[in-house]
Structures are given as C-alpha cells and as structure tokens.
Amino acid sequence: MRTRARLADQRRTLGQRGEELAARYLTRHGMRVLQRNWRCRDGEIDILARQDRTLVVVEVKTRAGRRFGTPLEAVDETKRARLRALGYRWARDHGCSARIRVDVVGILVLPGNQWFLRHQRGVA
C-alpha cells in the first residue's frame, strides 16, 4: 500500500512541476496567466491565460518516459472538445467575451532529469 501511495505522490508532484514549468513558459512567450487549476462540476482547466484578445485554455500533460505514448497523444478529441466547452463556461462565468483557443503543453521527462516541453496551439 505504501508503494502505491508513494507512486501517487510522485505522479502528483511531477504534474505540479510540469504545470509550473508550463506557466513560466507561457508567461515568457507573451501570455498572462489568469488562473490555474480552475474547477467546476464539469471538469478542470489546468491553466487559463490571455494572449492579446484571446482566452487560452491550456491542458498540461507531463509524462516520465514514453511508455504510455507522448504527453500530447494523451489529449484526444473528446478531451479537446471538453476543454473548449469548459473555456466557454469560464468566460461566461467571468464576463469575458474574448475568442477562445485550446492549447496543449506536453512535457516529457527522461532519465537524467531531462525535461522537454512542446506547445501545440489551437488544437480545438
């Protein structure tokens, strides 16, 4: 049981580190992070950011190794559509009339603590 709990903690920590890296990356590339880990009954958005007049809904996927495919492959069409719907809901709830774009930031961590980030814009 301890091993399972430890693995869950490691995954959570990896995910948090990935989201922090993604937020810094987005900021360096001209976006303003509005909110992180926004939740409602229909789901969660990892990062909400603004770039010019566009509200950007960002899904962050961090993976340690390629065993289960790349991080970007983990975000399928169903997930992309759900993220777009969540973006519209956030915008409505916050009185935001900006155009909405869904991006995915995939982070792959390889042995030797090598972190690789890939940003796909406008996936939905």
UniProtKB/Swiss-Prot annotation:
CDD domains: PoNe_Nuclease
Highest rank taxon of the organism: Bacteria
Record Gene3D superfamilies: 3.40.1350.10
Name of one Pfam family that matches: UPF0102
Disulfide bridge positions per record: none
An annotated Gene Ontology molecular function: nucleic acid binding
Family matches, as HAMAP family: UPF0102
Record-stated family: Belongs to the UPF0102 family.
Name of the protein in question: UPF0102 protein Tfu_0669
